[in-house]
Every structure is written in structure tokens, then in C-alpha cells.
């Protein structure tokens, strides 16, 4: 007489489906956490050590070398104390007047930019703070997508959480673009005025702050009436600008 063979319990179809869905989701979540950890590790490292390059600098150098293989960037890091206080005030007055008050996002500026974009029926003004601009420069491309904006938001939160306002401003002034192949305020001061960043006058600082939105364009159009008028407005706002 044959013994009856034990039967395996049938795996239910819903359980198979849930397992099939759960594994890719866990893999995706793990990949996302690793990706964000890469940003976080860099930011924590920069609390004590200064970045020597940025994603934007690398992109610009790649483009420049397509035309000239021997092209190089002009860039020299200088510490916070070696940067003119006039320049710090000018940049805050021009780019982020509430820099010391917000936590990375200036909602009043965002609202103003949104209304301006609706009025002009195009995406022009962005209302980005210094922290948001730093996030883009350090890690991201210049594309305007929802995915890039979400990464920018997360990186901005990390910058504000792990770096002081003083450190954020110091890195920002040292890595943003100021002209064609010109990065950082020391290279900019020497390129435009033949002096160090520490020696910039209020008028020179205001002019440099005025070209930040489109530095390559203004590099060859330094006396445009619109630009000079903007620099005068920034100059008038220097006394009210608060720096860390």
C-alpha cells in the first residue's frame, strides 16, 4: 500500500503578485537612499574641506574643450575672511535679501517669481535662494525638469541642515560662474579689475553681483545701461544687507 505523498500548500496568487511588486520597490528605495547618501556625504565632508570643482564647472569645461582641447578654467579658492564684505553684501542684496532669515527657500520670492512668470507667460524668473543656487551648481545639470527640481529641493535642505549660513555663502562665492571660464570671486576680481577679492570696492562689488544671472553674456557687454543701472540699485542696498 502506497503512502500518500504530502502536498505543498499552494501559494496564493495575491501573495505572488505582492512579492513580485515588493522586490523592485525595495530595490528602487535602496538605490534612492544610496543616491541621496552620496550627496549627504559630500556635504558633510565640505563642513571642513572645500570643494575644488562642481558639476557646473565640469560641464562648462567639457563644452569649452569641444572648441579648444587645451581650454582651462580660471578658479582659485579664497577663505571667507579674504573676501570683501562689500562683495558679500552686494551678492546678498542682489540674489537673496532674506538669506539669513529663511531655511533655504524664500516663499515670498517664489510667489513674486510665479506671478511674474504668469504675467509674461513664460518661465523666466525662478526666485531661487543662494542655497538653491549652490545645490544646482554643486551637483546638478541646467535642465529644467520636475526630477531635477526635486533633487535640488532635497540637496538644499541638506545644505541648510549641515552647513552654516557663513559656510554656504563662502562656498557659493567660490564656485559660481562669473564669466566665460571664470569661476569663484578671486578669479573674477582679478579678471575684471586686476585686484584680489579682498580689495573690491563697494561699486566693484555691486557690479560683480549684477552680472551673476548671466555672467558670460555680460563678460563682453560690461557697460550696458541696463547692467549699470542694476549695479547702482544694488550699491544703494548695500547698507541694509546683512551678512553671516
UniProtKB/Swiss-Prot annotation:
- The enzyme's E.C. designation: 2.4.99.28
Q: Which superkingdom?
A: Bacteria
Q: Please indicate if the UniProt record lists Mitochondrion as a keyword.
A: no
Q: What class of enzyme is it?
A: transferase
Q: Which NCBIfam families match?
A: mono_pep_trsgly
What HAMAP family is this protein classified in? PGT_MtgA
This protein is called: Biosynthetic peptidoglycan transglycosylase
Q: Which organism is it from?
A: Nitrosomonas europaea (strain ATCC 19718 / CIP 103999 / KCTC 2705 / NBRC 14298)
Amino acid at each position: 500500500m502506497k503512502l500518500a505523498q504530502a502536498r505543498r500548500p499552494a501559494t496564493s496568487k495575491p501573495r505572488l503578485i505582492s512579492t513580485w511588486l515588493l522586490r523592485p520597490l525595495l530595490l528602487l528605495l535602496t538605490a534612492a537612499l544610496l543616491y541621496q547618501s552620496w550627496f549627504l556625504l559630500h556635504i558633510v565632508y565640505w563642513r571642513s574641506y572645500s570643494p575644488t570643482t562642481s558639476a557646473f564647472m565640469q560641464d562648462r569645461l567639457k563644452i569649452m574643450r569641444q572648441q579648444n582641447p587645451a581650454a582651462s578654467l580660471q578658479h582659485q579658492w579664497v577663505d571667507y575672511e579674504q573676501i570683501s564684505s562689500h562683495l558679500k553684501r552686494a551678492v546678498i542684496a542682489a540674489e537673496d535679501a532674506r538669506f539669513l532669515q529663511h531655511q533655504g527657500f524664500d516663499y515670498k520670492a517664489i510667489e513674486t517669481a510665479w506671478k511674474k512668470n504668469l504675467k509674461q507667460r513664460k518661465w523666466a524668473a525662478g526666485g531661487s535662494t543662494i542655497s538653491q543656487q549652490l545645490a544646482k551648481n554643486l551637483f546638478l545639470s541646467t535642465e529644467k525638469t520636475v526630477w531635477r527640481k526635486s533633487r535640488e529641493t532635497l540637496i538644499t535642505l541638506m545644505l541648510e541642515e549641515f552647513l552654516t549660513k557663513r559656510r554656504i555663502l563662502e562656498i557659493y562665492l567660490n564656485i559660481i560662474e562669473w564669466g566665460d571660464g571664470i569661476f569663484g570671486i578671486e578669479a573674477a576680481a582679478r579678471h575684471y579689475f586686476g585686484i584680489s577679492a579682498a580689495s573690491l570696492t563697494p561699486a566693484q562689488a555691486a557690479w560683480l553681483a549684477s552680472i551673476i544671472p548671466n555672467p558670460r553674456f555680460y563678460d563682453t557687454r560690461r557697460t550696458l545701461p541696463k547692467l549699470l543701472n542694476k549695479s547702482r540699485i544694488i550699491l544703494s542696498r548695500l547698507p541694509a544687507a546683512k551678512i553671516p
